[in-house]
Amino acid sequence: MDYSLTVLLPKTDFPMKANLPQREPHWIEVWEKEKVYSTLLEKRKNCPQFILHDGPPFANGKAHMGSGLNKILKDIVLKSRNMLGFQCPYIPGWDCHGLPIEHKVMSEYPALAADPLSIRNKCKEYARYWIEIQKEQFRRLGILGSWDNPYITMDPGYEAAELRLFAELVEKKWVYRGLRPVFWSVGCRTALAEAEIEYQKKEDIAIYVEFPVGEEELKKAGLPQGTSFLAWTTTPWTLPANLALAVSPDLSYELRQVGGKKFIVAGKLAESIPGFSHSVVLLSFPSGQNLEGLKYNHPLLPREGVVYTADFVSGETGSGIVHIAPGHGMEDYQLGMVHGLEVYSPVDDQGRFTKQCGIEKIVGLSVFEANSILCAMLKEKGLLWAKYPYVHDYPFCWRSKTPIIFRSVPQWFIAIEAFKSLALKEIERVNWIPSRGENRIKGAVESRKDWCISRQRYWGVPIPAFYKKSGEAILDPSIIRRFADKVEEEGTDLWFRLESKELCQLLGLAPSEDLVKGLDTLDVWIDSGSSHYSVLKPRGEDPADLYLEGSDQHRGWFQSSLLLSVASKGKAPYKSVLTHGFVVDLDGKKLSKSSGARDLSEQIQTYGADLLRLWVASEEYAEDVPFSKEIFSRLSDSYRLIRNSLRILLGNLHDFNPQEQSLPDDRLREIDRYFELCVNKLVKKTKAFYENYEFSQVYQALTRFCSVELSSFYIDILKDRLYCDGQNWLSRRSAQTVLYRTFECLVKLLAPILPFTTEEAWRASGKTSSIHLELFPEEREIKEEEKLLKRWEKILQLRDLANRELEKARKQKMIGKNLEAKLILFTDDFEAEDTALLTEVFLVSQLEIIRSSKTEILVEKALGKKCPRCWKFSLFAQSNSDPQYPHVCPRCLKVLKGLPESFLVSD
């Protein structure tokens, strides 16, 4: 007889092969058809809210793996918070204005350069196109949210709210217009924010320049003829704008003779200056303060400058003397403000010298082209002491990839310095994950100067300012609010469409030939940074519970949002901030769109969204996250383990109706009650990991449970009961009761990470509604839990000992499989009544307990004959001469003859 036909093998429609790229789209359609997102919001309407505010990605090109990492992390947070009993509305957003899009449009349509409205229309089309592409990519990841109603920074409603926030800042006197140095992109011809700067290695010319002391000053100070200040600079092109020299009040200075020349330099730096190794000290000055007020002659132009002290002068490099050009450096500017120096910047928006520079040879040249000419002029005058190549970190424009310059032009600023201390206090009130994020953003804010918010571009929200012919600016909160009301109806194109007179009339200003509308637009960091005001505030969700972005956003969105929120309402816009690293290759190099990063859609098509999500969950997201085929090969093994665990559970529940056939706790077998403790432990720690955003710990806990507790331990032990006991025996239903509870717990705990796989398994179990509407499982109360745990601690120790002894017997060829063995257990911890339990747990055919104070296990060959149905050895099987079922064991004979479980057949 073929006894294999009589055992109850697992059956399930849940396939072993996942085919994720092919199967996953079906579930997206199901979620759409069943309106799972809106149903979930309704189901949790009486629950506390948890608001994760989406940082808007830029609507420019396909989403890359870094974007995928970010969105998956957010969705894991939201799904887990939903299952923890929160209502979690998710409003995705897109950032649309700014240089990258305008730069792209201008390169494709150069003929539109003089037509602002046409440029803006093309920019809108471009942004809308990529929003739809990215939206589908993100939805394909299994992310639930308000995809049909996202927030988009170029929408009129959003722009209007942004302008109303701007009006508040103007009203609070945080906004001013000033002439001061700003980061200037020559490639894009606009001012840039600090967050739009990328530092790269750049080779420049470093020079030591002589600034001769004037004749009158020599006499006043008692200095010898031919004395010069020797200054070091890596930007020779700024020399035409030199108006002062700076020395340190904390350094001592010396007058040194080198050959026929005499130089004033910092004493501690003298020996490091080229050619100074044999210099002679003529005079000493205890402090830079002894030099303050001295005048010098400009090395290239017929004018004088004055020496001032400044704390920023370093004693680490150079000569201890810094040349000051207030129009081309922030520290220079600030020193100039103290001493009433002109903010002088003879450079146009293309980075070329104007006639104002006073040096005919360099007029019309770019500042970098002028370097060599200026050096040649200095050399010709005998005022170039040394020149050499110098490699340093230099700021570049993030979009044009060209080196930026500091240039002074009239711009609009937010007075960060005025409320910086409050912003720093708010940083301390926020929960930063990981904690090092606090110091990172603190450092960024502490060093932050006033924020240049005006841009000389068309594609952005216009600054609704008017200018008189005299240059006086009119920026009035009431006018801004009126304009915002109009923008809500018509959009910001209105500003570019109407003439100045029409705008004046529309906004309640008396039309005048003297008033001209401004053409500057707001920095795009104002766009995204005002999202707490534009999106959260109207929904009553401000402050958000969580902002979650890459670590670069300490300089970007986290900071702009913080500063605008503190400026408008005195508080941070978020309670917690979580940051993740960059996606990198195996060499640790960052992947990004512009450098040809792997396309997100391509990876979804290769691996499936669930495997990408498992990758995100498995990594320590706070660090840079490696991405490679090797990593995904290992992850595939983990995924197969999880999927196979779900399949085993489903397969062994094919004939189980939990509503009708579940057993109460007091009728469960002891091992089943113990395994419920294991499941309880998993539930408790996994929920805690989710709450604390420790997703790699979730991954490790769940994969370990599937591999060790479930597959290697529990399922291995249960197979005999599940396959060979009678279908409706209580022993089998006890196992199935706990397997069902295990399935429900495991599939729910996996759901935030593997939404597609768990949905498929959930529906395969007979459920008709989405798993994503469920809550996480609660821990079950288990009778005499501590006593049970202590007892099973001993059982598992014995199991380890038994396995070691069985392995020895196997190596000695005494046995093959465990079922060929009989164990003699010497112990005083267990009684004869535990024999059946320990036999089952140790996976042997027979076991005998002998009372002994010394714990020991002996292995013998099992007695009797192997049952052809269950493969256990039995004396009964040896003597069983049943005409229909000869040589089967007592248990199998009862099953085959349809006898009740309680019927006694003696072995």
Curated annotation (Swiss-Prot):
Its cofactor is Zn(2+). Monomer. Its EC number is 6.1.1.5. A motif ('KMSKS' region) lies at residues 590-594. Disulfide bonds: none annotated. ATP binds at residue 593. It is found in: Cytoplasm. IleRS has two distinct active sites: one for aminoacylation and one for editing. The misactivated valine is translocated from the active site to the editing site, which sterically excludes the correctly activated isoleucine. The single editing site contains two valyl binding pockets, one specific for each substrate (Val-AMP or Val-tRNA(Ile)). This is Isoleucine--tRNA ligase. One of its GO terms (molecular function) is zinc ion binding. Zn(2+) binds at residues 867, 870, 889, 892. It comes from Methylacidiphilum infernorum (isolate V4) (Methylokorus infernorum (strain V4)). A motif ('HIGH' region) lies at residues 57-67. Keywords: Aminoacyl-tRNA synthetase, ATP-binding, Cytoplasm, Ligase, Metal-binding, Nucleotide-binding, Protein biosynthesis, Zinc. The gene is ileS. L-isoleucyl-5'-AMP binds at residue 549.
